[in-house]
């Protein structure tokens, strides 16, 4: 089974959070809202990136050369 790998980038601390392993992009978007909406600061500081995929059959990662931007928290809660 293939899982998508996502992580939230915090532009204030200039770091990525713990990776999220999801079946669909919608789960990652929901995790972004649930995990970061109550944090102080600008919602635009938290951006969701797709990092690649994880194959559960052979436990292998296939990561993108560069993370692919999905959306920011501001786009989800304000738009």
Predicted segments, located by residue:
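Intrinsic-disorder/low-complexity peptide segments enriched for small residues
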Residues: 1, 22, 71-74
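Short aromatic-glycine-(Arg/Gly/Cys) micro-motifs in beta-strand/loop hairpins
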Residues: 1-15
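Generic structural motif
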Residues: 11, 25, 53-54
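Charged, amphipathic alpha-helical segments
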Residues: 24-36
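Short, mixed-charge low-complexity intrinsically disordered segments
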Residues: 36-79
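A short, exposed loop/beta-hairpin motif centered on an aromatic-Gly-Thr core
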Residues: 15-24
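Eukaryotic short linear interaction motifs
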Residues: 15-16, 29, 57-58
């Amino acid at each position: 089974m293939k899982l998508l790998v996502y992580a939230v980038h915090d532009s204030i601390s200039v770091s990525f959070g713990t990776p999220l392993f999801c079946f669909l992009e919608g789960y990652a978007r929901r995790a972004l809202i649930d995990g970061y909406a109550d944090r102080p600061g600008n919602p635009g500081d938290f951006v969701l990136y797709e990092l690649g995929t994880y194959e559960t059959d052979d436990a292998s990662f296939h990561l993108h050369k560069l993370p692919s931007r999905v959306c920011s928290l501001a786009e989800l809660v304000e738009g």
